[in-house]
């Protein structure tokens, strides 16, 4: 893992010593090299055991795709932020890139930690750079309110997890992911019920599950483009990754305690999808769409089947790339219209036809059109849900229909219709923006051609 961590850490002195003229191009190039280097983790991919194992860090079939996604996203965030950060003083630009790089370093350590307490520390540490990015570089004064929601929801969910980890250490004598899988917890005792809820709550808030999701739309709407990208693509998946790890460890208790959470997750798919149909704010619609998709991921994980886990991992990776691209597209519209309102951005297809093509492709990816990896993930979760209970097809089927509806609503509202007069003298699209979206779709195409890279246990 040091082959990724050391180059990432070496970015810090580079950022603060570079000539301002080369700041953005050099950091983008360096981060792209790290992203290319991360692809070598697939070579160490082992279907039966941990790879790159040392005392503190290791990778396996769950963490490898998420680490690579984290490394791939840093250059994309830097490219996306160039335009709106160019007017800032040079030291603020350096601070901004430093926060993005520190997030990557923390996330790599979180995804590759073998000790649960190290994972917990890194899980909480990602909160600090994200909070600074939202509250310092957000667009409006509501960013402070969004930051408070983000901070207190996450902290309130994480405190019970810390208590549960201390209890686990006292009873089991170890907090290693590798050894904890061998220790079974006896079911049907009040202590273990509270232990299971405490361990899972932090990750359900982070995903987020419907009911504890109110921080996410606020944080997404107020964050700058890089904040929205990292939040949608990686930080929500940190909750899913933690759930996969913890529910396997708490296995006997999961089967009996997961039922209400599965039903809440499925109900949340329909509710948040319905909320999307009523949104007038572009970023808010994409944010609620993320809550809907994460509800499907949560239900797939809580089912505790091989297909459920694999579908959840595939959907997390595919959704990370798709939602990040949608936030980039929303940012391109915002930079030209200075508004996130869908009605003020309509008719842009006539002025920016290539950008409208990107909107169309990403809207189709969001609604899980074949043969995209989004469909693979959703199908595997739907099949495992149907095998668990035939009645779930009513909720998941309705949720899929609503997802298709709001994805098309997003495209039609933002691209079709008469062009408002204020958009007549709009700035044309840049090569930088098309490069950014191309770098989003290349991994999606790769996963269409070779899906076994992220199929985990099912391959």
Swiss-Prot record:
Q: Which EC class does it fall in?
A: translocase
Cellular component, GO annotation: mitochondrial membrane
The record gives the membrane topology as: Multi-pass membrane protein
- Name the predominant localization: mitochondrion
Q: In Gene Ontology terms, what is a biological process of this protein?
A: ATP synthesis coupled electron transport
Which spans are transmembrane here?
20-42, 61-81, 103-123, 148-168, 194-214, 224-244, 257-277, 284-303, 307-329, 350-370, 392-414, 435-455
What Pfam families does this protein's entry cite? Oxidored_q5_N, Proton_antipo_M
Alphabetically, the GO molecular function entries are:
NADH dehydrogenase (ubiquinone) activity; ubiquinone binding
Please provide the record's keywords in A-Z order: Electron transport, Membrane, Mitochondrion, NAD, Respiratory chain, Translocase, Transmembrane, Transmembrane helix, Transport, Ubiquinone
Compartments in which it is found: Mitochondrion membrane
Q: Which domain of life is it from?
A: Eukaryota
What EC number(s) is this enzyme filed under?
A: 7.1.1.2
| Swiss-Prot/TrEMBL catalytic activity | a ubiquinone + NADH + 5 H(+)(in) = a ubiquinol + NAD(+) + 4 H(+)(out)
- Protein family: Belongs to the complex I subunit 4 family.
This chain's function reads: Core subunit of the mitochondrial membrane respiratory chain NADH dehydrogenase (Complex I) that is believed to belong to the minimal assembly required for catalysis. Complex I functions in the transfer of electrons from NADH to the respiratory chain. The immediate electron acceptor for the enzyme is believed to be ubiquinone.
* Name of the protein in its database record: NADH-ubiquinone oxidoreductase chain 4
Q: Corresponding gene? A: MT-ND4
């Amino acid at each position: 893992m040091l082959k990724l961590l050391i180059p990432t850490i070496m970015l810090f002195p580079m950022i603060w010593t570079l000539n301002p003229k080369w700041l953005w191009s050099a950091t983008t190039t360096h981060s792209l090299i790290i992203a290319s280097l991360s692809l070598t983790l697939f070579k160490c991919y082992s279907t039966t055991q941990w790879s790159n194992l040392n005392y503190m860090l290791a990778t396996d079939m769950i963490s490898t795709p998420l680490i690579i996604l984290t490394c791939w996203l840093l250059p994309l965030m830097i490219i996306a932020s160039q335009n709106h950060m160019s007017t800032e003083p040079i030291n603020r630009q350096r601070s901004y890139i430093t926060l993005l790089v520190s997030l990557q370093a923390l996330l790599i350590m979180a995804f590759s930690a073998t000790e649960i307490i190290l994972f917990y520390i890194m899980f909480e540490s990602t909160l600090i750079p994200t909070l600074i990015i939202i509250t310092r570089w957000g667009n409006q004064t509501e960013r402070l309110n969004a930051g408070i929601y983000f901070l207190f929801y996450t902290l309130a969910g994480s405190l019970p997890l810390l208590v549960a980890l201390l209890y686990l250490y006292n009873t089991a004598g170890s907090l290693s992911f590798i050894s904890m899988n061998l220790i079974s917890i006896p079911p049907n005792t009040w202590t273990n019920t509270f232990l299971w809820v405490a361990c899972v709550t932090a990750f359900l808030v982070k995903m987020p599950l419907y009911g504890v999701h109110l921080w996410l739309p606020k944080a997404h709407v107020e964050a700058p483009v890089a904040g929205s990208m990292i939040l949608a693509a990686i930080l929500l998946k940190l909750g899913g990754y933690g759930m996969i790890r913890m529910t396997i460890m708490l296995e006997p208790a999961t089967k009996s305690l997961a039922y209400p959470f599965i039903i809440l997750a499925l109900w949340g798919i329909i509710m948040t999808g319905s909320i999307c149909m009523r949104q007038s704010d572009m970023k808010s619609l994409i944010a609620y769409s993320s809550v809907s998709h994460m509800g499907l991921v949560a239900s797939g994980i809580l089912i505790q089947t091989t297909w459920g886990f694999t579908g959840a991992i595939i959907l997390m990776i595919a959704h990370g790339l798709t939602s990040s691209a949608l936030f980039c597209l929303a940012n391109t519209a915002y930079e030209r219209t200075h508004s996130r309102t869908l009605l003020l951005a309509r008719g842009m297809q006539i002025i920016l036809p290539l950008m409208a093509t990107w909107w169309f492709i990403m809207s189709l990816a969001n609604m899980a059109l074949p043969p995209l990896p989004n469909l693979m993930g959703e199908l595997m979760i739907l099949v495992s849900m149907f095998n668990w209970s035939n009645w779930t097809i009513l909720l998941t089927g309705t949720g899929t229909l609503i997802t298709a509806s709001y994805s098309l609503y997003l495209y039609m509202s933002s691209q079709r219709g008469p062009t408002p007069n204020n958009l007549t003298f709009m700035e044309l699209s840049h090569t930088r923006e098309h490069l950014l979206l191309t770098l989003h779709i290349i991994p999606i195409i790769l996963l269409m051609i070779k899906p076994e890279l992220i199929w985990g246990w099912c391959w």
